[in-house]
Protein backbone atom coordinates (compact mmCIF):
# COMPACT_ATOMS: atom_id res chain seq x y z
CA UNK A 1 0.00 0.00 0.00
CA UNK A 2 1.20 3.50 -0.83
CA UNK A 3 2.19 5.14 2.47
CA UNK A 4 0.07 8.18 1.56
CA UNK A 5 -3.02 5.98 1.53
CA UNK A 6 -2.47 5.27 5.22
CA UNK A 7 -3.24 8.88 6.10
CA UNK A 8 -6.73 9.45 7.45
CA UNK A 9 -8.88 11.31 4.95
CA UNK A 10 -10.91 13.03 7.66
CA UNK A 11 -7.87 14.36 9.51
CA UNK A 12 -7.13 18.06 9.12
CA UNK A 13 -3.42 18.37 8.32
CA UNK A 14 -2.42 22.03 8.13
CA UNK A 15 0.81 22.68 6.26
CA UNK A 16 2.39 25.84 7.69
CA UNK A 17 5.04 27.33 5.44
CA UNK A 18 6.71 30.58 4.49
CA UNK A 19 10.03 32.06 3.49
CA UNK A 20 13.07 31.94 5.73
CA UNK A 21 12.81 34.37 8.68
CA UNK A 22 9.18 35.12 7.85
CA UNK A 23 7.95 34.34 11.37
CA UNK A 24 6.91 30.68 11.19
CA UNK A 25 8.39 29.97 14.61
CA UNK A 26 6.46 32.84 16.21
CA UNK A 27 3.20 31.55 14.77
CA UNK A 28 4.06 27.96 15.69
CA UNK A 29 4.76 29.00 19.28
CA UNK A 30 1.42 30.79 19.45
CA UNK A 31 -0.44 27.70 18.25
CA UNK A 32 1.50 25.52 20.67
CA UNK A 33 0.64 27.82 23.58
CA UNK A 34 -3.01 28.51 22.83
CA UNK A 35 -4.24 25.41 20.99
CA UNK A 36 -4.11 21.79 22.10
CA UNK A 37 -2.90 20.60 18.71
CA UNK A 38 0.09 18.38 17.83
CA UNK A 39 2.80 20.16 15.84
CA UNK A 40 5.28 18.33 13.62
CA UNK A 41 8.34 20.27 12.47
CA UNK A 42 10.19 19.24 9.30
CA UNK A 43 13.41 20.92 10.44
CA UNK A 44 13.39 18.95 13.70
CA UNK A 45 12.79 15.72 11.81
CA UNK A 46 15.63 16.58 9.44
CA UNK A 47 18.01 17.04 12.37
CA UNK A 48 16.97 13.67 13.79
CA UNK A 49 17.56 11.99 10.43
CA UNK A 50 21.23 13.03 10.24
CA UNK A 51 22.26 12.15 13.78
CA UNK A 52 25.31 9.85 14.09
CA UNK A 53 24.79 6.27 12.87
CA UNK A 54 21.55 7.03 11.04
CA UNK A 55 21.12 6.25 7.34
CA UNK A 56 21.18 9.95 6.47
CA UNK A 57 24.35 10.51 8.50
CA UNK A 58 26.19 7.68 6.77
CA UNK A 59 25.14 8.84 3.30
CA UNK A 60 26.27 12.41 3.99
CA UNK A 61 29.58 11.18 5.39
CA UNK A 62 30.13 9.02 2.30
CA UNK A 63 29.42 11.97 0.03
CA UNK A 64 31.31 14.78 1.78
CA UNK A 65 33.92 12.86 3.75
CA UNK A 66 35.20 13.49 7.28
CA UNK A 67 35.49 17.23 6.63
CA UNK A 68 31.79 17.50 7.40
CA UNK A 69 32.20 16.18 10.97
CA UNK A 70 32.17 18.67 13.83
CA UNK A 71 35.22 17.42 15.74
CA UNK A 72 35.69 20.48 17.94
CA UNK A 73 32.34 20.79 19.68
CA UNK A 74 31.29 17.21 20.33
CA UNK A 75 32.58 13.71 20.96
CA UNK A 76 29.84 11.97 18.97
CA UNK A 77 31.28 13.07 15.62
CA UNK A 78 28.03 14.74 14.66
CA UNK A 79 27.68 16.54 11.35
CA UNK A 80 28.71 20.18 11.38
CA UNK A 81 25.37 21.59 10.25
CA UNK A 82 26.70 25.13 9.85
CA UNK A 83 29.44 23.89 7.52
CA UNK A 84 26.92 21.76 5.65
CA UNK A 85 24.67 24.81 5.13
CA UNK A 86 27.62 26.82 3.83
CA UNK A 87 28.59 24.09 1.37
CA UNK A 88 25.12 23.64 -0.10
CA UNK A 89 24.68 27.42 -0.23
CA UNK A 90 27.76 27.79 -2.42
CA UNK A 91 27.48 24.62 -4.49
CA UNK A 92 24.21 23.94 -6.29
CA UNK A 93 25.10 20.33 -7.05
CA UNK A 94 25.65 19.63 -3.35
CA UNK A 95 22.34 21.31 -2.50
CA UNK A 96 20.55 19.18 -5.07
CA UNK A 97 22.17 16.03 -3.68
CA UNK A 98 21.19 16.88 -0.09
CA UNK A 99 17.64 17.75 -1.15
CA UNK A 100 17.28 14.46 -3.02
CA UNK A 101 18.51 12.58 0.04
CA UNK A 102 16.66 14.34 2.85
CA UNK A 103 13.34 15.47 1.40
CA UNK A 104 12.02 11.92 0.83
CA UNK A 105 13.31 10.81 4.25
CA UNK A 106 11.67 13.75 6.02
CA UNK A 107 8.43 13.23 4.12
CA UNK A 108 8.30 9.54 4.99
CA UNK A 109 9.02 10.29 8.65
CA UNK A 110 6.39 13.03 8.76
CA UNK A 111 3.78 10.67 7.31
CA UNK A 112 4.67 8.11 9.99
CA UNK A 113 4.22 10.80 12.65
CA UNK A 114 0.85 11.82 11.17
CA UNK A 115 -0.30 8.21 11.38
CA UNK A 116 0.72 8.10 15.04
CA UNK A 117 -1.60 11.06 15.61
CA UNK A 118 -4.46 9.42 13.72
CA UNK A 119 -6.83 10.01 16.64
CA UNK A 120 -6.20 13.75 16.53
CA UNK A 121 -8.68 15.60 14.36
CA UNK A 122 -6.19 18.38 13.56
CA UNK A 123 -2.39 18.54 13.38
CA UNK A 124 -0.03 21.25 12.16
CA UNK A 125 2.91 20.40 9.90
CA UNK A 126 5.60 23.09 9.88
CA UNK A 127 7.38 22.67 6.54
CA UNK A 128 9.61 25.57 5.44
CA UNK A 129 10.20 24.06 1.98
CA UNK A 130 6.70 22.68 1.56
CA UNK A 131 6.42 23.57 -2.12
CA UNK A 132 10.07 23.13 -3.03
CA UNK A 133 10.10 19.62 -1.52
CA UNK A 134 6.63 18.76 -2.85
CA UNK A 135 4.89 18.04 0.47
CA UNK A 136 1.54 19.37 -0.73
CA UNK A 137 0.02 15.91 -1.02
CA UNK A 138 0.24 15.18 2.71
CA UNK A 139 -1.56 18.42 3.66
CA UNK A 140 -5.30 19.00 3.53
CA UNK A 141 -4.75 22.76 3.54
CA UNK A 142 -1.79 25.12 3.33
CA UNK A 143 -1.17 28.25 5.40
CA UNK A 144 1.44 30.67 4.08
CA UNK A 145 3.17 33.28 6.24
CA UNK A 146 3.46 36.67 4.56
CA UNK A 147 6.45 38.86 5.34
CA UNK A 148 8.04 41.69 3.30
CA UNK A 149 11.45 40.83 1.87
CA UNK A 150 13.09 43.79 3.63
CA UNK A 151 11.81 42.57 6.99
CA UNK A 152 12.90 39.02 6.14
CA UNK A 153 16.34 40.36 5.30
CA UNK A 154 16.68 42.28 8.57
CA UNK A 155 15.55 39.30 10.65
CA UNK A 156 17.91 36.96 8.81
CA UNK A 157 20.91 39.27 9.23
CA UNK A 158 20.21 39.58 12.95
CA UNK A 159 19.43 35.90 13.52
CA UNK A 160 22.21 34.29 11.48
CA UNK A 161 24.76 37.11 11.71
CA UNK A 162 25.30 37.23 7.96
CA UNK A 163 25.81 40.04 5.45
CA UNK A 164 23.04 41.75 3.52
CA UNK A 165 24.26 40.09 0.32
CA UNK A 166 24.17 36.63 1.93
CA UNK A 167 20.70 37.31 3.31
CA UNK A 168 19.32 38.22 -0.11
CA UNK A 169 20.98 35.21 -1.73
CA UNK A 170 19.51 32.91 0.91
CA UNK A 171 16.02 34.34 0.45
CA UNK A 172 16.32 33.99 -3.32
CA UNK A 173 17.07 30.27 -3.04
CA UNK A 174 13.40 29.74 -2.13
CA UNK A 175 10.27 30.23 -4.17
CA UNK A 176 8.85 33.74 -3.95
CA UNK A 177 5.84 34.57 -1.80
CA UNK A 178 3.89 35.41 -4.95
CA UNK A 179 4.50 31.97 -6.39
CA UNK A 180 3.66 30.17 -3.14
CA UNK A 181 0.51 32.20 -2.62
CA UNK A 182 -0.99 30.76 -5.82
CA UNK A 183 -1.15 27.35 -4.15
CA UNK A 184 -1.99 28.37 -0.57
CA UNK A 185 -5.37 28.35 1.16
CA UNK A 186 -4.73 30.85 3.95
CA UNK A 187 -2.35 33.84 4.14
CA UNK A 188 -1.10 34.80 7.61
CA UNK A 189 0.10 38.40 7.44
CA UNK A 190 3.16 38.81 9.66
CA UNK A 191 4.21 42.13 8.14
CA UNK A 192 3.89 44.36 11.20
CA UNK A 193 0.90 43.84 13.49
CA UNK A 194 0.75 40.33 14.99
CA UNK A 195 -2.94 40.78 15.70
CA UNK A 196 -3.60 40.28 11.99
CA UNK A 197 -2.51 36.66 11.93
CA UNK A 198 -3.66 36.01 15.50
CA UNK A 199 -7.20 37.02 14.56
CA UNK A 200 -7.04 34.85 11.45
CA UNK A 201 -5.95 31.81 13.45
CA UNK A 202 -8.66 32.39 16.05
CA UNK A 203 -11.25 32.40 13.29
CA UNK A 204 -10.16 29.23 11.51
CA UNK A 205 -8.54 27.03 14.15
Swiss-Prot record:
Pfam families: CoaE (PF01121). The gene is coaE. Keywords: ATP-binding, Coenzyme A biosynthesis, Cytoplasm, Kinase, Nucleotide-binding, Transferase. Its main location: cytoplasm. It is found in: Cytoplasm. Its EC number is 2.7.1.24. GO terms for cellular component: cytoplasm. It comes from Prochlorococcus marinus (strain MIT 9312). Catalyzes the phosphorylation of the 3'-hydroxyl group of dephosphocoenzyme A to form coenzyme A. Residues 13-205 form the DPCK domain. SUPFAM superfamilies: P-loop containing nucleoside triphosphate hydrolases. Belongs to the CoaE family. The keyword Acyltransferase does not apply. Pathway: Cofactor biosynthesis; coenzyme A biosynthesis; CoA from (R)-pantothenate: step 5/5. This is Dephospho-CoA kinase. GO terms for biological process: coenzyme A biosynthetic process.
Amino acid sequence: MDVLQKLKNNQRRIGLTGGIASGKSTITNYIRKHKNIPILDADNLSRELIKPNTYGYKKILDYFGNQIIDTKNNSEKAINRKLLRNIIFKHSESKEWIDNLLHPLVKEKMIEECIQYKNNQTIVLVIPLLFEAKFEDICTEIWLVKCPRELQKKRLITRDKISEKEAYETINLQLSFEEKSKFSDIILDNSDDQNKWINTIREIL
